[in-house]
Amino acid sequence: MRNAQQYIESLRDGREVYIHGERVEDITQHPSLRKAIDHGALDYELDKRPELRDLLVTKSPRTGNEIRRYFEMPRSAEDLLRRQELIETTTRADASWVVFMKEIGTDALNALNMVCDDIDKKYGTEYASRVMKYWQYLEEHDLSMAGAVTDAKGDRRLRPSEQEMPYYYLKVVERRPDGVVVKGCKVHTTSSPITNELFVLPTRAMAESDRDYSIAFGIPVNTPGVKIISRPERGDLAEFDYPLSARHTTLEAMTIFEDVFVPNERIFMNGEWEFAGPLANCFATWHRFTGISYKYPFSQMMIGVSALVADYNGVPRASHIQDRITDLVIYAQCIKTFGRAAATQCIITDNGVAYPNPLLCNIGKYLFASGYHTSMKAVQEIAGGLPATGPTEADCKNPATKELIERYLGGRKGVDAISRLKVMKLVRDMGGTDGAGEWWVGTLHGEGSLQAQRMSISREYDVKKCVDYVKTLLEVK
């Protein structure tokens, strides 16, 4: 397995990355990108901690070598519970900011492993064996992965093949004996500027007319024609003022494919349009299981910072404070419970994969996304205005203002101004900074929008069974 430095060195590969209007020749030297890289590198450091090693590392069933547990194919509810614990634990170790180096990539691997079997059975293709060879390659080289799933979409009323601009959805523009050439753009691709490999999956169900848009593959990030435009990020934040986002961030980007060649051995769907929807839905379920798993530590942080603020302010037992904290506990435990239920009530597929319960994954993800803003409101209510108006670290060090801050911003007896400000800065960074803004939007739309979850819940739940129950009860037809 690689270490952090080997991961960082692997990013000096000539990839075409842009940020803040400039092409970055060496992303490891750019301050904004380097912050995300250092955050990602934690994935290659945590296994060195003795207390985490047994959880993070396992043996490959193919080679017997040590591998990251992310590459373990879940075969049972116990395996899924361990995957949940893995994501939860690594997120908590990284200040409740999920790493996203292998989570999304292995979500894609698990989805492809399930759906490609069905494609092969219908068409006699060899996609499943290609997926397993790629899986082994990623595992043996300990590579990081990004998932490029969401297309630019253009006019949402129209199918991919009906768009005025034909590349709003990634499209196969040429088929060759040795592979295909693709053109288009994927958006919101988390970590694509700083990972080794790109998984590309369809974002929606397709019609036969959308055959050229029904494509799935995996390629290196530095493949010629791949151009990445990162969202803006600051690399110069003071840790006192930004206790989370000074050191932790995940970068999202536009990932553009300008006539990119994909060899046959890396293609996992190529025109089998009727399987695009099942693959998109299968990936969404795996990814929402990941979402439930990484959101729980953040919800615990909400509880902890709220209780600490209340204590520092001298009102830990005030009834309205206790009401808000109880609401946060309910929110957190709903997330945890649906994650565990999705694992324990999993579906074992024909090829032996333990598939998280789709209905419960979608309900869990819907609850954490729809409740996030209300929960952060509770944190902000408890904290008051100081997270937004408090002085900076520079003010706390300035001889002209230091003593004044210490005199007036202390809390209850025994709580000094600096300790109180540190907690307030955490509240601010959770709910009122650029980094917090990413969380506000990302929690709603990451792993799919609220409407996407509603559609999945409606599809998965057997309403007819409930209707039949009422008919039987009333003895009506």
Region locations from a protein language model:
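Acidic/polar, glycine-rich intrinsically disordered N-terminal extensions of enzymes
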Residues: 1-60
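Generic structural signal for well-ordered, non-transmembrane alpha-helical segments
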Residues: 34, 38, 136-139, 297-300, ...
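A structural signal for well-ordered alpha-helices, especially hydrophobic packing surfaces
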Residues: 41-44, 310, 332, 336-339, ...
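Glycine-rich flavin
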Residues: 58-197, 203-217, 222, 227
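FAD-binding core of flavoproteins
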Residues: 147, 152-293, 458-477
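Extended amphipathic alpha-helical segments enriched in small hydrophobics
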Residues: 290-349
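Short, charged, amphipathic alpha-helical segments
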Residues: 322-326, 354-362
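Alpha-helix capping/hinge segments and adjacent helical runs
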Residues: 359-477
